[in-house]
Amino acid sequence: MNINDALTGVSRLFLDTAPVIYFVERNPHFVDLVDPIFERLEANITAVVSPITLSECLVGAIRLGLTDLEQAFVDVLEQDEVVFVDIDASIARDAARIRVRYNLQLPDALQVATALTAGCEAFLTNDTALKRVTELRILVVGELVV
């Protein structure tokens, strides 16, 4: 699917972990696909993330002792233009239902529940298992074209 078509009608986009890692670490396989999306985030789409996105992004940098990379993730995800949605009891209950309905791992179900609570129309990921979810437009990075 073409990136512009994929983002048509999207005003709030949930960012799963992988696309953020591709963007910050400049992954050569995916950076040409995520850059245009992140440019749109600065212009006319609101990015939404959860504590799971932030903590999963930080794991590799912390494990390797790369404080500059750790800070780069924090800088991207904690900027004023990014909506950071905390996971509360209501989201946890929704995640349990989503996990059962779609047979997802709990972190994925929490991410989807957070996106729905935040009013996102689309969810950017590279996890094809999430394509089972029907309440959101699931955008798989590896299936997008510029």
Regions found by a protein language model. Name each.
Residues 1, 112-146:
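Acidic, metal-binding active-site segment of PIN/NYN-like and related structure-specific nucleases
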Residues 9-10, 43-44, 79-80, 101, ...:
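Structured helix-beta-strand junction loops
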Residues 2-4, 82-124:
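Active-site neighborhoods of divalent-metal-dependent phosphate/nucleic-acid chemistry enzymes
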Residues 46, 83, 137-139:
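Conserved beta-strand segments of alpha/beta enzyme cores
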Residues 1-49, 62-75, 128, 143-146:
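Short, well-structured N-terminal submotif of metal-dependent ribonuclease cores
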Residues 50-52, 87, 141:
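Conserved beta-strand termini and adjacent loop/short-helix elements that scaffold enzyme active sites
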